[in-house]
């Protein structure tokens, strides 16, 4: 199995459940070049990991991080944030 195979449509942003449990879940996210995961908040702490590609993560507190394969960012609860794909990218979000 490969994470790329989880996204069958060429949408700018695609998300699909990778793993669910009572204690948390993991979501596979694909962002195409120029695609943007719109501004939103999370109610719980989260971890975003870049598996492939390059994205820019930003939040309303002024944090701006370029994520390359192997890079990650901790996402604070109740803080608006968004992600833009510099090139086609594969990410994993753990909550």
Which residues does each predicted region cover?
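Histidine-centered metal-chelating micro-motifs
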Residues: 36-37, 72-73, 78-82
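A short, N-terminal "cap"/entry segment at the start of jelly-roll beta-barrel domains
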Residues: 1-27
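Conserved short histidine dyad/triad with adjacent acidic residue
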Residues: 12, 25-42
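Glycine- and acidic-residue-biased ligand/ion/polar-headgroup-sensing regions
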Residues: 44-55
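Ligand-binding loop in jelly-roll beta-barrel domains
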Residues: 77-95
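A cytosolic small-molecule/anion-sensing beta-strand core signal
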Residues: 51-52, 68-69, 87, 95
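Short acidic-glycine-tyrosine-enriched beta hairpin
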Residues: 61-77
